[in-house]
């Protein structure tokens, strides 16, 4: 039973480390651009969009669809980068456990 107690302590320690890492992720940001930098989206590590910057050069009232496409592209790229950041930061906890989609 000694091993079981050690294992429980280890799991509790790992859980605390994971919670700390998740809190730290909230403070991290990623930035993605589209249209050669015409649209920039900044997202937090917990997938909140924090900022959207649009160059005046891309604002064309006759082509709103292009602007919408650039915003979507930059937003999706930012969220992809967040997923990569989460995998990098949290993957160390699930390494070798084969738990796809956990984070």
Curated annotation (Swiss-Prot):
Alphabetically ordered keywords of this record? Cytoplasm, DNA-binding
Q: Which Pfam families does this chain map to?
A: YbaB_DNA_bd
| Family under the similarity heading | Belongs to the YbaB/EbfC family.
| Protein's cellular compartments | Cytoplasm, Nucleoid
What is the protein's given name?
Answer: Nucleoid-associated protein BH0035
HAMAP family (UniProt xref): DNA_YbaB_EbfC
* MF-aspect GO terms: DNA binding
The organism's place on the tree of life at top rank = Bacteria
Query: Does the record carry Cytoplasm as a key word?
Result: yes
Q: Kindly report the protein's main subcellular placement as a broad class.
A: cytoplasm
Q: What does this protein do?
A: Binds to DNA and alters its conformation. May be involved in regulation of gene expression, nucleoid organization and DNA protection.
Cellular component terms (Gene Ontology): bacterial nucleoid; cytosol
Does the record's keyword annotation contain Manganese?
A: no
SUBUNIT field: Homodimer.
Q: Report biased composition (Low complexity) as residue ranges.
A: 1-20
Q: Where is this region: Disordered?
A: 1-29
């Amino acid at each position: 039973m000694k091993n079981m107690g050690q294992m429980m302590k280890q799991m509790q320690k790992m859980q605390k480390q994971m919670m700390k890492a998740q809190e730290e992720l909230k403070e991290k940001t990623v930035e993605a651009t589209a249209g050669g930098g015409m649209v920039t989206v900044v997202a937090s590590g917990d997938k909140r969009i924090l900022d959207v910057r649009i160059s005046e050069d891309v604002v064309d009232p006759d082509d709103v669809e292009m602007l919408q496409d650039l915003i979507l592209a930059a937003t999706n790229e930012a969220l992809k980068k967040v997923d990569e950041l989460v995998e990098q930061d949290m993957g160390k906890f699930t390494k070798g456990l084969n738990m796809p989609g956990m984070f």
